[in-house]
Regions:
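A short, Lys/Arg-rich alpha-helix, primarily the initiator
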Residues: 1-20
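Short alpha-helical DNA-recognition segment
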Residues: 15-33
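Short, basic-rich loop-to-helix N-cap that marks the start of a DNA-contacting helix
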Residues: 39-51
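Short, charged recognition helix plus adjacent turn
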Residues: 9-10, 61-72
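The DNA-recognition helices of helix-turn-helix-type DNA-binding domains
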Residues: 28, 39, 64-67
Length: 72
C-alpha cells in the first residue's frame, strides 16, 4: 500500500500549503483529497508535486506492505 505521510511533512517544511497548491499551482482539490485518503495518484501528479516542492519521490510517498495488498 502506498501512503502519502511523507508528503504532509514535506508540505509543512516547504512553506506551501494545500491552499497555495490549489490556488497558485493548479493542483486540484480532488488530488488533495486523494493525498489525504491514500488513494492512487498518477505519475504526472507526483512529478508536479516533486517539482513544486523541490523534493524527491520518497518525500511524497512511501510503500508500506499490507495484508490488503492485491495478490499477484
Amino acid at each position: 500500500m502506498v501512503v502519502y505521510t511523507p508528503f504532509w511533512n514535506t508540505l509543512r517544511s516547504s512553506g506551501e500549503s494545500t491552499y497555495t497548491l490549489i490556488k497558485n499551482h493548479h493542483i486540484s482539490s480532488s488530488t488533495i483529497d486523494k493525498l489525504r485518503h491514500n488513494k492512487p495518484l498518477n505519475t504526472t501528479t507526483i512529478n508536479d508535486l516533486c517539482r513544486i516542492l523541490s523534493c524527491k519521490v520518497e518525500d511524497i510517498l512511501l510503500y508500506v506492505p499490507s495484508d490488503d495488498d492485491q495478490i499477484l
